Amino acid sequence: MPRYFFDTYDGNRLISDSEGIELQSVEMARIEAQKALPDLARDALPDGNQKTFIVSVRDEAGQVVLRAALTVIVETAPDNRSA
């Protein structure tokens, strides 16, 4: 079974996966990457109004086979903005 590596970027730091996990296909890797994004966002809430979280998936040869991103945008409602 192929091994995939999930590198994460939270807007401030890149964490490279050196262990990886064995999955049946790139499609299964896509599902795992999508599941990881909400956890990344929860662990590193945006300091400002917007932040993008990225999971890059590499195969055993080191080639990026897919990339998933989640952007969190925080906007204050017009009635609640400071004057």
State where each predicted segment sits.
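A short, structured loop/turn motif at beta-sheet edges
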Residues: M1, L23-M28, D59-Q63
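Short aromatic-glycine-(Arg/Gly/Cys) micro-motifs in beta-strand/loop hairpins
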Residues: M1-S16
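A short, exposed loop/beta-hairpin motif centered on an aromatic-Gly-Thr core
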Residues: I15-Q24
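Long, contiguous binding/interaction regions
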Residues: E22, R42, R81-S82
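Charged, amphipathic alpha-helical segments
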Residues: R30-D43
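C-terminal structural segments of small proteins and small subunits
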Residues: P46-A83
